Regions:
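Structured alpha/beta reader/binder surfaces that contact nucleic acids or chromatin modification marks
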Residues: 1-105
């Protein structure tokens, strides 16, 4: 199974079902179930299904979909987040009852 390393607060938002697009700098060909790894923890804390990618997205598209990616538009408009304009679409995120140790290959 592939893994996706995600920083806070984004991974918690994904696991709570609040965030459905994980913003990245590039598209992925990966589809299906992926492990969700909390950045810096060395733990798999959940799973989600990658169903597709969109982008690179324009500022207007990012603005129209803020409820899906949950990133402040100030981050994009200031240029701080402009490298993250490709959305990885996630569905069915679930927390694991007990986090599983993960070692990066």
């Amino acid at each position: 199974m592939k893994g996706l390393i995600v920083d806070e607060p984004w991974i918690s938002k994904i696991l709570r079902g609040e965030k459905h697009w994980e913003m990245r700098s590039q598209a992925t060909a990966v589809r299906g179930l992926v492990a969700l790894i909390r950045k810096g923890s060395g733990k798999i804390v959940g799973v989600a299904r990658v169903t597709g990618c969109r982008g690179p997205l324009s500022l207007d598209e990012l603005r129209a979909n803020k409820d899906r990616h949950c990133v402040s538009m100030d981050e994009f408009e200031s240029g701080r987040a402009m490298k993250w304009t490709t959305a990885w679409e996630l569905i069915g995120a679930q927390s694991l009852p007990t986090p599983v140790p993960y070692k990066h290959p």
